[in-house]
Swiss-Prot record:
Its main location: cytoplasm. One of its GO terms (cellular component) is cytoplasm. Homodimer. The ends of the coiled-coil dimer bind to each other, forming polymers. Interacts with FtsZ. Keywords: Cell cycle, Cell division, Coiled coil, Cytoplasm, Septation. It comes from Shewanella baltica (strain OS155 / ATCC BAA-1091). Residues 3-66 form a coiled coil. Belongs to the ZapB family. It is found in: Cytoplasm. This is Cell division protein ZapB. InterPro entries: Cell_div_ZapB. Non-essential, abundant cell division factor that is required for proper Z-ring formation. It is recruited early to the divisome by direct interaction with FtsZ, stimulating Z-ring assembly and thereby promoting cell division earlier in the cell cycle. Its recruitment to the Z-ring requires functional FtsA or ZipA. GO terms for biological process: division septum assembly; FtsZ-dependent cytokinesis. The keyword Transcription regulation does not apply. The gene is zapB.
Length: 73
Protein backbone atom coordinates (compact mmCIF):
# COMPACT_ATOMS: atom_id res chain seq x y z
CA UNK A 1 0.00 0.00 0.00
CA UNK A 2 1.15 3.45 -0.70
CA UNK A 3 1.41 6.13 1.93
CA UNK A 4 -1.44 7.99 0.28
CA UNK A 5 -3.78 5.00 0.68
CA UNK A 6 -2.69 4.53 4.28
CA UNK A 7 -3.34 8.20 4.95
CA UNK A 8 -6.84 7.97 3.42
CA UNK A 9 -7.54 4.83 5.44
CA UNK A 10 -6.36 6.54 8.62
CA UNK A 11 -8.63 9.52 7.88
CA UNK A 12 -11.62 7.25 7.34
CA UNK A 13 -10.89 5.29 10.50
CA UNK A 14 -10.56 8.50 12.50
CA UNK A 15 -13.88 9.76 11.10
CA UNK A 16 -15.53 6.44 11.98
CA UNK A 17 -14.15 6.60 15.54
CA UNK A 18 -15.43 10.15 15.97
CA UNK A 19 -18.85 9.08 14.70
CA UNK A 20 -18.87 6.17 17.15
CA UNK A 21 -17.99 8.51 20.03
CA UNK A 22 -20.77 10.93 19.05
CA UNK A 23 -23.25 8.07 18.85
CA UNK A 24 -22.13 6.82 22.27
CA UNK A 25 -22.74 10.28 23.74
CA UNK A 26 -26.16 10.50 22.08
CA UNK A 27 -27.03 7.04 23.38
CA UNK A 28 -26.04 8.07 26.91
CA UNK A 29 -28.22 11.19 26.64
CA UNK A 30 -31.17 9.11 25.44
CA UNK A 31 -30.68 6.64 28.30
CA UNK A 32 -30.72 9.55 30.74
CA UNK A 33 -33.90 10.93 29.17
CA UNK A 34 -35.52 7.49 29.32
CA UNK A 35 -34.60 7.18 32.99
CA UNK A 36 -36.04 10.61 33.75
CA UNK A 37 -39.24 9.79 31.86
CA UNK A 38 -39.53 6.47 33.68
CA UNK A 39 -39.23 8.20 37.06
CA UNK A 40 -41.81 10.79 36.02
CA UNK A 41 -44.12 8.02 34.83
CA UNK A 42 -43.82 6.26 38.20
CA UNK A 43 -44.65 9.49 40.01
CA UNK A 44 -47.68 10.06 37.81
CA UNK A 45 -48.87 6.49 38.35
CA UNK A 46 -48.57 6.93 42.12
CA UNK A 47 -50.43 10.23 41.95
CA UNK A 48 -53.12 8.65 39.78
CA UNK A 49 -53.54 5.81 42.27
CA UNK A 50 -53.89 8.30 45.12
CA UNK A 51 -56.47 10.33 43.20
CA UNK A 52 -58.42 7.17 42.34
CA UNK A 53 -58.51 6.25 46.03
CA UNK A 54 -59.68 9.77 46.95
CA UNK A 55 -62.39 9.60 44.30
CA UNK A 56 -63.59 6.27 45.62
CA UNK A 57 -63.68 7.70 49.14
CA UNK A 58 -65.66 10.74 48.03
CA UNK A 59 -68.07 8.57 46.06
CA UNK A 60 -68.69 6.48 49.18
CA UNK A 61 -69.30 9.62 51.25
CA UNK A 62 -71.71 11.06 48.68
CA UNK A 63 -73.54 7.75 48.41
CA UNK A 64 -73.86 7.69 52.20
CA UNK A 65 -75.19 11.25 52.30
CA UNK A 66 -77.68 10.54 49.52
CA UNK A 67 -78.82 7.49 51.46
CA UNK A 68 -79.35 9.65 54.55
CA UNK A 69 -81.31 12.20 52.53
CA UNK A 70 -83.49 9.48 51.03
CA UNK A 71 -84.23 8.01 54.45
CA UNK A 72 -85.19 11.47 55.77
CA UNK A 73 -87.64 12.05 52.93
Amino acid sequence: MSLELLSKLETKIQAALETIELLKMELEEEKQKASTLSEHNQQLNAQNQQLQEELTSWNEKVTGLVGLLNSEI
